[in-house]
């Protein structure tokens, strides 16, 4: 039975699959549209399972306010092209809406959207992963997104503009803690041991080495804490000094960046082509 272009078009619109996949599915079912859809759904799930081994290190960070809190969500894909795709973003925003409605756990979000995720993987041909969801409580909240890849929410006692600027600062400067005294004792101890060893290797007298370590530790805790950093809007002041002048306070922040901690697989072009050829021979 000859398959018409109209049939292929209809199947593409109903499944979102590629033209050649649609044509092949219709040929295998002698033009039976519903059977072709069923078969593609089955094979799509199989394709999704194969894609699960691929590294999803691209994607988007989304932010939404709930009742007295905000939610930050990271959903990953494999390429920046898919990260801008309407189907991918629609899926990510659907997950975000559910999270913002009632602080749903990551495990429950994954379970609730697994069927939709598998269907999306089959449709776009990339691994998709709902990777992280973070909630931050506060009555005064300000958020900032830098493109699609970085999202920040800051809460505290300050006007909206101040908190917004501080969220921009957090996006750019990547502090890990609010205040120097918030740096965990084990982090401080590890850095202090390192600085002592460095000072000893430099051959400094004990008294001078001790002062050097104190100074270096102050610099270390300042650089990784928000209030100890130089404020990007007024670099001659620390964020702490700026907040004191404003009579303001930051109580918490969360910063997420797409792909943090994911080791992205690097392949040269020749290897990539060879892999595609090998895959086509197996198909």
UniProtKB/Swiss-Prot annotation:
PROSITE patterns found in the cross-reference section: EF_TS_1, EF_TS_2
Region of interest: Involved in Mg(2+) ion dislocation from EF-Tu: 79-82
Domain of life: Bacteria
CDD domains named among the record's database cross-references: UBA_EF-Ts
GO-annotated cellular components: cytoplasm
One Pfam family this sequence matches: EF_TS
Keyword set, alphabetical order: Cytoplasm, Elongation factor, Protein biosynthesis
GO molecular function, one term: translation elongation factor activity
Compartments where found: Cytoplasm
UniProt KW Manganese keyword: no
InterPro entries: EF-Ts_dimer_sf, Transl_elong_EFTs/EF1B, Transl_elong_EFTs/EF1B_dimer, Transl_elong_Ts_CS, UBA-like_sf
Entry keyword Phosphoprotein: no
PANTHER family, A to Z: ELONGATION FACTOR TS, ELONGATION FACTOR TS, MITOCHONDRIAL
HAMAP family the UniProt entry points to: EF_Ts
Annotated function: Associates with the EF-Tu.GDP complex and induces the exchange of GDP to GTP. It remains bound to the aminoacyl-tRNA.EF-Tu.GTP complex up to the GTP hydrolysis stage on the ribosome.
Family assignment from sequence similarity: Belongs to the EF-Ts family.
Protein name: Elongation factor Ts
Lineage of source species: Bacteria, Pseudomonadati, Pseudomonadota, Gammaproteobacteria, Alteromonadales
Gene behind the chain: tsf
């Amino acid at each position: 039975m000859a398959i018409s272009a109209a049939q292929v078009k209809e199947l593409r619109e109903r499944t979102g699959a590629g033209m050649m996949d649609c044509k092949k599915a219709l040929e295998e079912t002698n033009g039976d549209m519903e059977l072709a859809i069923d078969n593609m759904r089955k094979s799509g799930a199989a394709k999704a399972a194969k894609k699960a081994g691929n590294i999803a290190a691209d994607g988007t960070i989304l932010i939404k306010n709930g009742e007295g809190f905000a939610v930050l969500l990271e959903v990953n894909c494999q390429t920046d092209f898919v990260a801008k795709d309407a189907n991918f973003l629609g899926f990510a925003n659907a997950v975000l809406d559910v999270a913002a409605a009632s602080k749903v756990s990551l495990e429950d979000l994954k379970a609730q959207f697994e069927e939709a995720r598998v269907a999306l993987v089959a449709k776009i041909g990339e691994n998709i992963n709902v990777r992280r969801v973070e909630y931050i409580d506060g009555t005064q909240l300000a958020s900032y997104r830098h493109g699609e890849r970085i999202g920040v929410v800051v809460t505290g006692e300050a006007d909206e503009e101040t908190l917004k600027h501080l969220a921009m600062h957090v996006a750019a400067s990547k502090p890990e803690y609010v205040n120097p005294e918030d740096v965990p004792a084990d982090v401080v101890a590890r850095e202090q041991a390192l600085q002592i060893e460095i000072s000893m290797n430099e051959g400094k007298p004990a008294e001078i080495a001790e002062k050097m370590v104190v100074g270096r530790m102050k610099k270390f805790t300042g650089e990784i804490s928000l209030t100890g950093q130089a404020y990007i809007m007024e670099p001659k002041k620390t964020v702490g000094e700026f907040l004191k002048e404003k009579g303001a306070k930051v109580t918490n922040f969360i910063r997420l960046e797409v792909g943090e901690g994911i080791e992205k697989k690097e392949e040269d072009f020749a290897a990539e082509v060879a892999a595609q050829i090998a895959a086509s021979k197996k198909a």
